């Protein structure tokens, strides 16, 4: 298992380098201009100067190389400096965002908490809801509960968040006035009141996101449970005189969780990737909003860095999912 | 109290609700199980054996079945008799595992793969006997010892897949015995196991029964096992009980036609002694059967010399080969035209690998395979493609070896399509002829594999193998998965084809009785090597190698008078065939003890 | 027990009896099984209705989806409410000629829904088919040919990591002009969008198919096929693909939904069809701002998208069962 | 009293990414920064200049502007303190000039300093700006929200190429304004607290400002008008029915102000045919049919501008046919501008011999069918306009193919993209443009022949229509040399007329800026000539 992990990690390096190159070239090819949001009143010569000041005058390969150095060499130093108070990175140029002229990583670090809070909670909520639904639907296959579950999850799956998001805002903020329609990212949770406030502002985005994730996860859980409910060992467990609860919730569930856990693990990068539309609808201003904003403003270093971090997470969690599989299922041995 | 039966099944009827309306699983089945007695229930697949036993546990309900009438009276340890048919599930929970234990057919799947053996063993104990963890573990270890599992402490922490099939089945037995039930139901506990392991398990159950006085309800379709185990026998046929009697009555004086047919279909070890050539079995219901020995010829069709097949074991960061599985090690034999060479041996000894190596379905390491004078190992892909036309294979599992998504006609036609032998209506005709050949109605051509019984399926596999008019067929456990009656038909079919078409067979099996019936030559394999090879009569009547002798001893005989006891058995676990890269095995050397009868003189590992 | 069984107890007489029945045609079987699946049948019928509605609706319906009333008509005809609105608000502005009302520019909602459905369904199906083809291809090849496995799986990682929007921009730059020259502006955008959605959504299918292929490859019938001289391409097409159909079907049903929604998100961001070219996603999106005033404008496209997804899902369930001979036999 | 009214919440649906307007130039950034850093003089809501950090507005009459119009002398107010307690001096002003004109700095506001040859500081409170040539309007430097004064002490180390490295300074400039940055989360939210060094001891009334960014205009409007979570929402580009429905909730109201922003249809004066090579496409004049006055006039006549205003902008829009509709004096109102005349348009085309010869409902001119590609950026109102105009044009036999392009591509000047508005690979395109301040001279320059974007100029250039007219060029030259206000206005009107009559563009709507504030927010005075938040020091809670 260890060698498997190490081997895959080593393999990941060229993969990621290649991915970063592809992303870079893609962004390079994409039309758009960092000056797009500068008002039309600013004349083109000035824009051209501003472009040069951003380093756009240099050839492509040099910029790619610079980015590589900044991302893989300087940023880790900055990280070390921040943790240990050293000064390795002093004076080195970090990956700088074109929109804000500040280090990209700083903004990412600033954004991450919101995203993790909202998308992460949604993910957890979805898991907490989806698993029981999936389990029960499978256990009572074709019952009305199961049919309802199918129906609701399909609807949940097919309703785009720009609709469901606005819908809950209209209902809960505008009509009922229960929750704020705009997420306050400056809120510091340090007391019961602020905690309640935080909960209130998280309810709606979490609800919208969780609906979609629940829809998919519960389908998965159901299928996996169905696979296992008909296995011979379930009969063995019953023949031992175990209660239905233990049979289903211990024996069957433990086996059914194996594929589901890997699916969950595979979905984790998307937590960090944020939820572009939902974040936008609720003004959560997390990573997803950062990315879409950066794409719209053609802030290439930002887009490149964010997508690349995302790629790293995807590759990493692919690996984690495989390893988890090996851990959860004693039959699987990676040599 | 003593002569009162532990379980009485009266007029049991079980129905299953399916899409096409209710299906009757068993109808009006009645029999008793007395204390300390082993009742064997026999019958072909689908005859309702499992359904009866599951009803007794009230587990049919979880499979969609329903007990629509009848009583299942069970004599509880305390509290007298109850009708299990209408107890609630809460009470059933206390009875299951505690007063009735059950052993299931498939040791590979009957255990939960993700829990340790210890956990699964102690579960029942902790519920029914209110033991704490330590007590339960102590008892579990004791149980493992009772079922003769070596190193029980270590096994407790292992997962099922880390144990061999035999050990797993013992764990299942230990689990069923854990709470000392009054009734033990064993649903085909040995069907999936090797002869040697089967013999051990049967002996073990017999001993446990005698030691604890538990009543046993033993379900099987193997008459030899019945002869070995039963006190009383219940014969079932298509959901009904057709006959009941003591084991001697049944074997010596069967009343019902079905029972008679069943007994006729069982190949008995020793039946062929004195005959030099194999001949088809005499079956009930097939009147105009001609039983003639199949002689074959002396012409060598396949010559295998020093065949070595190894599978690499990869590891390390670079996934280099770190060791090899020595699946086939220096094996030589000859197959004669129109004759059958059988390879026998325990699971994992390399029989299949040898068979596949000959067709180059796995690539052998070295050696020589000469088929009709052509060196098979030297062919390139195109030539090999052509050569395979003359060599075909039939696989063990008739369920797995047919594509579930293809109509039978297409599956049989596929080889001819591949070689462009026929097309259009000619192809249709040839397929139809093949169906005739294997005695399947032509109307089956449009069916799918799942619509066929196992035997019929295996005939399709045979038809497919025959489609190219091969000269040699490698039959890898071609009948192992079949019911006795079906097995007999398939065996007869194979022999018929051999007689008519002059086919040669390389017959791979672990069933000594079957091998005795069909072979001209027999090779006994152990750990990748042939330890003994020679004409069938000699090898069976005069086994020379220690392993062959042990193997012969293990085979149960379908005769209640020839029971075996545990102490006759003497098997060592097979050593690992995995060796590291610089291991070089010594070449096999044989001694010719009689003309054509060779025995391995070098160390075989046994 | 029947007489036949008595005479020949070893024969499976039930099988024998069946054997006398006339051979059934395969498609007949599929249809029979499909019919017996209640959900599938209703899903299928619903889907058919939707398809017929969007394909033939505009041909027989009297209003034109792109027509904007002008002059004095404009004020009169805009913001018309659906006729059922009269049930609770008889004073609302409505007209039987516009059964579902009109939008803020006076375009007829029903005809826009029908017209938009054509586009959405076409995009959804085409993109789904493309994604399935790609996903199955990659999955099968990766699963079957061990040597390509690592490479293809890393490729999957790459595609998972690629951001959709820049890709769309790049594709638009590279291909839009030439495509719209050869197949017209709408056709060009259609091909572009379908390709993009397809290219960015095949990865989950590939992963699942690969896993199944890995398992099926080890089944004996594949070995058997090899021993009877079947070439690898035929092994894949005859033996492996039919057996991974069921996960592919599941991906397909989810794929349609994702494709329809992705298309709407693209229109939303300005990368989609020309603005006067309605699609369900765009209708939904355009109406969100006036959701409280004119709830019907969001509800109808929303309901239609959901219904399509739902019906396709049930349809897929039924088809999967019907195409699997094992289930069909039961 | 300072800080007595608690917190005010402002929402901008575009989030500020930096608080240094010299590095960004985006309106959102300029306006967010205007809470902190201030110019010497500002425009008030009626477009008049008011002294801000300066004592008074220098003019020729008070001697602040030299007679030859080549220098202007500003006197700073005394005793103005930076928020760190140090005093504002003329050195800071001079530094700001140096900062922005540094060749490697990429300053977005460098045009403000166009023509400036030097900035002198005779003493701590005097700044003399010298121009290379006579400058009739010398109020570019240090006037308005785009040209505020930076603190020398803070930005000294951030000149030129180092500018982006000073993240702390760019995110938290020290200023003289009513508020001080407390925390800046780029592209998300800014919190400000009242500046206790602010020159007016009773201001600002609010102690804190929460400045939230992101989302979309609908959500911003909803947050102010419907849920009341926010007090002020900027630039609500929403359809009027949506706005009025939101206002119906009674939590706040929308206010509009009019600058020179005009939504217009640009007519391509060159041939955009894809068959032409990359160096000729949208370069060679004339357009196959748009150059015919009958065609573009008919196109203009077929448009119902009043309806467009009603559909798209409501009270934030006015019918206009002027390129420069504000300041009002420059506006023209050609006859028939506010009425739709489809019949007239048809007659005009018929008369010009542009008729439908092949019976497909589309007219042909010299065999070329009048099919136009009509593009704009993605935006709900613009798409509605497209649909309406397409319909109207179809009634005069002109077929329009619509295309909408993502704004960041459309307005991004990427020479590699075929979809930018500068490339104009279409026959007609619609967008809005404006200019800063009140003097349109350089804006009128956007119609000069040599400002047309070409491959040679990397497709940069403001003459998007590729309009070219000798008379126009001559008049513009005359305008540059004229200081007399009445004369300037007269020339301006002529220029407006030429561009309309000769097919440079079809102005559609004079757009105002529509912002919304809560009923409880007092002191809002919507200003379109400067930062909307220009008078935030006067904002207060109203009952
Ligand atoms: N869950 C079920 N649903 C429908 N029919 C069933 C079910 N289980 C069993 N049956 C039917 O009941 C009959 C008896 O089956 P049973 O499993 O008892 O056979 P068996 O004698 O144990 O066969 P085998 O030797 O193959 O185990 C069969 O015809 C079978 O088709
Ligand atoms: N593809 C393979 N890769 C690695 N090892 C293999 C492979 N196939 C077989 N082996 C190993 O080779 C040995 C011989 O296997 P083989 O299948 O030939 O045994 P067998 O006698 O046919 O057993 P059975 O009766 O169970 O079929 C076993 O140890 C098995 O684990
Ligand atoms: Mg059974
Ligand atoms: Mg084998």
PLM feature spans:
Chain C
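Non-cytoplasmic
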Residues: 166-170, 174, 194, 248-282
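Amphipathic cytosolic juxtamembrane alpha-helices at the membrane-cytosol interface
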Residues: 107-122, 126, 146-153, 206, ...
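Gly/Trp-centered helix-boundary motif
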Residues: 1-136, 147, 236, 259-260, ...
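Conserved G/P- and acidic residue-centered "switch" motifs that form tight phosphate/ATP-binding loops
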Residues: 135, 139, 229, 242-244, ...
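Generic hydrophobic transmembrane alpha-helix motif, especially the helices
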Residues: 99, 130-144, 151-214, 219, ...
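Helix-loop interface residues and adjacent transmembrane-helix termini in multi-pass membrane transporters
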Residues: 144-145, 187, 253, 268, ...
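Alpha-helical transmembrane segments
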Residues: 198, 202, 206, 255, ...
């Amino acid at each position: 298992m260890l060698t498997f992990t190490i081997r895959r990690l080593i393999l990941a390096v060229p993969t990621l380098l290649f991915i970063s190159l592809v992303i870079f070239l893609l962004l390079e090819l994409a039309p758009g201009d960092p000056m797009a949001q500068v008002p039309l009143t600013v004349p083109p010569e000035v824009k051209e100067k501003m472009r040069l000041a951003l380093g756009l005058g240099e050839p492509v390969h040099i910029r790619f190389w610079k980015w590589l150095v900044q991302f893989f060499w300087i940023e880790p130093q900055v990280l070390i400096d921040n943790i240990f108070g050293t000064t390795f990175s002093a004076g080195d140029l970090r990956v700088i965002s074109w929109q804000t002229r500040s280090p990209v990583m700083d903004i990412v670090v600033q954004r991450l908490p919101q995203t993790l809070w909202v998308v992460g909670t949604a993910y957890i909520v979805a898991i907490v809801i989806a698993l029981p639904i999936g389990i029960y639907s499978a256990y009572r296959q074709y019952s009305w509960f199961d049919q309802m579950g199918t129906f609701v999850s399909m609807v949940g799956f097919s309703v785009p968040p720009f609709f469901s998001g606005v819908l809950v805002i209209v209902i809960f903020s505008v009509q009922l006035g229960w929750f704020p329609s705009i997420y306050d990212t400056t809120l510091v949770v340090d007391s019961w009141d602020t905690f309640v406030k935080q909960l209130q502002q998280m309810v709606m985005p979490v609800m919208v996101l969780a609906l979609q994730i629940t829809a998919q996860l519960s389908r998965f859980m159901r299928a996996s449970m169905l696979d296992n409910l008909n296995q011979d060992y379930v009969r063995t467990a019953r023949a031992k005189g175990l209660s239905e609860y233990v049979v289903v919730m211990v024996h069957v569930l433990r086996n059914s969780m194996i594929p589901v856990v890997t699916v969950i693990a595979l979905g984790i990068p998307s937590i960090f990737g944020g939820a572009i539309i939902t974040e936008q609808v609720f003004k959560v201003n997390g990573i997803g909003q950062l990315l879409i904003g950066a794409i719209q403003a053609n802030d290439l270093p930002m887009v490149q860095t964010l997508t690349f971090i995302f790629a790293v997470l995807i590759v990493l969690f692919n690996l984690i999912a495989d390893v988890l599989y090996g851990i959860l299922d004693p039959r699987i041995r990676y040599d | 109290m003593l002569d009162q039966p532990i379980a009485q099944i009266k007029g049991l009827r079980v129905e299953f609700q399916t899409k096409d309306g209710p299906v009757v699983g068993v109808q009006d089945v009645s029999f008793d199980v007395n204390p300390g007695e082993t009742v064997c229930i026999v019958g072909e697949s689908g005859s309702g054996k499992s359904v009866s036993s599951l009803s007794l546990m009230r587990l049919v309900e979880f499979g969609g079945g329903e007990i629509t009438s009848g009583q299942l009276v069970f004599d509880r340890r305390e509290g007298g008799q109850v009708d299990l048919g209408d107890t609630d599930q809460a009470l059933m929970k206390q009875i299951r595992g505690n007063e009735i234990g059950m052993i299931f057919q498939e040791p590979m799947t009957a255990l939960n793969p993700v829990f340790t053996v210890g956990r699964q063993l102690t579960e029942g104990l902790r519920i029914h006997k209110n033991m704490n963890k330590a007590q339960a573990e102590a008892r579990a270890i004791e149980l493992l010892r009772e079922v003769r599992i070596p190193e029980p402490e270590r096994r407790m922490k292992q997962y099922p897949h880390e144990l061999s099939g035999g050990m797993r089945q013992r764990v299942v037995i230990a689990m069923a015995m854990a709470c000392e039930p009054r009734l033990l139901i064993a649903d085909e506990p040995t069907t999936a196991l090797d002869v040697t392991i089967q013999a051990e398990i049967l002996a073990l159950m017999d001993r446990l029964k005698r030691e604890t006085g538990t009543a046993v309800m033993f379900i099987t379709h193997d008459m030899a096992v019945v002869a070995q185990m039963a006190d009383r026998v219940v014969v079932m046929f298509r959901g009904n009980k057709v006959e009941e009697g003591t084991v001697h009555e049944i074997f010596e004086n069967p009343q019902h036609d079905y029972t008679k047919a069943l007994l006729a279909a069982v190949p008995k070890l020793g039946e062929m002694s004195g005959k030099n050539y194999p001949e088809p079995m005499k079956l009930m219901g097939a009147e105009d059967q001609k039983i003639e020995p199949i002689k074959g010829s002396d012409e060598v069709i396949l010559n295998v010399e020093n065949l070595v097949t190894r599978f690499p074991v990869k590891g390390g960061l670079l996934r280099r080969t770190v060791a090899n599985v020595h699946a086939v090690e220096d094996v030589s034999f000859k197959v004669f035209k129109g004759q059958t060479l059988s390879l026998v041996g325990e699971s994992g000894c390399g029989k299949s690998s040898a068979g596949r190596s000959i067709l180059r379905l796995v690539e052998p390491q070295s050696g020589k395979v000469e088929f009709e004078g052509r060196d098979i190992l030297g062919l390139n892909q195109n030539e090999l493609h052509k050569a395979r036309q003359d060599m075909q294979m039939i696989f063990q599992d008739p369920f797995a070896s047919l594509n579930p998504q293809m109509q039978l006609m297409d599956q049989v036609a596929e080889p001819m399509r591949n070689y462009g032998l026929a097309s259009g209506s000619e192809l249709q005709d040839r397929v139809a002829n093949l169906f005739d050949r294997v005695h399947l109605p032509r109307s089956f051509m449009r069916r799918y594999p799942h619509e066929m019984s196992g035997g019929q399926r295996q005939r399709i596999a045979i038809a497919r193998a025959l489609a190219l008019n091969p000269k040699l067929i490698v039959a890898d456990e071609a009948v192992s998965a079949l019911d006795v009656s079906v097995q007999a038909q398939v065996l007869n079919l194979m022999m018929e084809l051999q007689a008519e078409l002059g086919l040669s067979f390389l017959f791979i099996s672990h069933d000594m009785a079957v091998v005795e019936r069909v072979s001209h030559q027999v090779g006994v394999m152990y750990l990748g090597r042939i330890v003994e090879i020679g004409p069938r009569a000699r090898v069976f009547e005069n086994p020379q190698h220690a392993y062959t002798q042990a193997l012969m001893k293990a085979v149960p005989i379908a005769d209640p008078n020839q029971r075996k006891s545990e102490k006759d058995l003497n098997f060592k676990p097979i050593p690992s065939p995995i060796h590291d890269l610089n291991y070089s095995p010594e070449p096999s050397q044989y001694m010719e003890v009689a003309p054509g009868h060779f025995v391995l003189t070098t160390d075989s590992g046994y | 027990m029947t007489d036949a069984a008595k005479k020949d107890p070893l024969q499976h007489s039930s099988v024998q009896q069946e054997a006398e029945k006339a051979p059934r045609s395969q498609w007949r079987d599929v249809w029979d099984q499909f019919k017996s699946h209640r959900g599938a049948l209703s899903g299928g019928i619903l889907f058919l209705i939707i398809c017929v509605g969007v394909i033939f609706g505009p041909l027989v319906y009297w209003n034109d989806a792109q027509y904007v009333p002008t002059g004095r008509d404009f004020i009169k005809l805009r913001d018309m409410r659906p006729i059922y609105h009269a049930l609770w608000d008889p004073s609302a502005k409505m007209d039987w000629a516009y059964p579902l009302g009109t939008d803020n520019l006076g375009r007829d909602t029903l005809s826009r829904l029908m017209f938009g459905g054509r586009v959405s369904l076409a995009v959804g199906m085409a993109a789904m088919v493309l994604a399935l083809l790609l996903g199955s291809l990659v999955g099968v090849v990766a699963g079957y040919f061990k040597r390509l496995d690592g490479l293809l799986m890393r490729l999957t990682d790459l595609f998972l990591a690629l951001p959709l929007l820049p890709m769309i921009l790049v594709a638009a730059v590279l291909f839009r002009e030439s495509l719209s020259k050869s197949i017209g502006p709408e056709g060009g955008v259609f091909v572009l969008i379908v390709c993009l959605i397809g290219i960015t959504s095949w990865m989950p299918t590939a992963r699942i198919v690969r896993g199944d292929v890995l398992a099926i490859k080890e089944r004996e019938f594949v070995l058997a096929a090899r021993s009877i001289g079947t070439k690898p391409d035929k092994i894949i097409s005859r033996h492996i693909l039919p057996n991974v159909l069921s996960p592919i079907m599941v991906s397909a049903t989810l794929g349609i939904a994702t494709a329809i929604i992705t298309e709407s998100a693209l229109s939303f961001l300005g990368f989609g069809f020309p603005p006067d070219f309605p699609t369900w996603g765009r209708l939904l999106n355009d109406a969100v701002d006036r959701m409280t005033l004119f709830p019907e404008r969001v509800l109808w496209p929303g309901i239609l998208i959901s219904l399509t997804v739902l019906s396709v899902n049930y349809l897929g369930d039924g088809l999967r069962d019907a195409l699997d001979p094992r289930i069909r036999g039961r | 009293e300072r800080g007595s009214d608690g917190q005010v919440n402002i929402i901008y649906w575009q989030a500020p990414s930096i608080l240094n307007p010299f590095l960004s130039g985006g309106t959102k950034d300029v306006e967010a920064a205007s809470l902190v850093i201030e110019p010497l003089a500002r425009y008030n809501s009626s477009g008049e200049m008011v002294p801000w950090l300066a004592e008074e507005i220098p003019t020729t009459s008070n001697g602040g502007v030299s007679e030859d119009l080549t220098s202007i002398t500003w006197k700073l107010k005394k005793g103005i303190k930076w928020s760190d307690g140090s005093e504002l001096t003329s050195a800071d002003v001079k530094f700001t000039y140096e900062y922005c004109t540094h060749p490697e700095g990429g300053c977005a506001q460098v045009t403000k300093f166009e023509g400036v040859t030097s900035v002198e500081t005779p003493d701590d409170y005097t700044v003399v700006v010298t121009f290379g040539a006579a400058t009739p309007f010398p109020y570019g430097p240090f006037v308005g929200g785009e040209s505020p004064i930076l603190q020398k002490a803070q930005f000294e180390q951030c000149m030129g190429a180092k500018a982006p490295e000073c993240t702390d300074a760019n995110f938290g400039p020290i200023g003289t304004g009513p508020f001080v940055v407390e925390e800046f989360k780029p592209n998300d939210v800014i919190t400000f607290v009242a500046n206790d060094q602010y020159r007016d001891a009773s201001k600002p009334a609010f102690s804190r400002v929460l400045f939230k960014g992101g989302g979309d205009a609908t959500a911003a409007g909803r947050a102010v008008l419907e849920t009341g979570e926010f007090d002020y929402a900027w630039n609500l580009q929403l359809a009027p029915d949506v706005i009025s429905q939101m206002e119906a909730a009674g939590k706040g109201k929308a206010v509009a102000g009019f600058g020179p922003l005009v939504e217009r249809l640009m007519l391509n004066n060159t041939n955009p045919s894809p068959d032409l090579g990359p160096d000729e496409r949208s370069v060679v004049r004339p357009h196959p049919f748009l150059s015919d006055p009958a065609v573009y006039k008919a196109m203009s006549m077929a448009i119902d501008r009043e309806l467009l205003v009603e559909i798209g902008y409501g009270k934030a829009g006015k019918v206009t046919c002027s390129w420069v509709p504000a300041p009002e004096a420059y506006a023209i109102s050609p006859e028939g501008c506010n009425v739709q005349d489809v019949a007239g348009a048809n007659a005009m085309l018929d008369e010009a011999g542009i008729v439908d010869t092949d019976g497909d409902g589309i007219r042909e001119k010299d065999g070329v069918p009048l099919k136009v590609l009509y593009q704009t950026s993605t935006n709900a109102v613009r798409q509605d306009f497209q649909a309406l105009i397409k319909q109207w044009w179809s009634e005069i036999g002109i077929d329009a193919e619509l295309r909408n392009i993502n704004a960041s591509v459309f307005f991004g000047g990427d020479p590699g993209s075929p979809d930018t508005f500068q490339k104009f690979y279409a026959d007609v395109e619609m967008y809005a443009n404006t200019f800063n301040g009140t003097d349109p001279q350089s804006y009128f320059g956007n119609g000069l022949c040599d400002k047309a974007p070409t491959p040679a100029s990397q497709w940069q250039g403001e003459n998007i229509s590729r309009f070219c007219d000798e008379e126009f060029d001559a008049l513009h030259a005359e305008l540059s040399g004229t200081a007399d206000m009445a004369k300037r206005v007269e020339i301006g009107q002529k220029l407006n007329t030429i561009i309309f009559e000769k097919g440079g563009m079809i102005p559609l709507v004079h757009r105002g800026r529509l912002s919304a504030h809560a009923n409880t927010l007092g002191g809002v005075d919507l200003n379109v000539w400067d930062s909307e938040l220009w008078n935030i020091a006067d904002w207060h809670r109203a009952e």
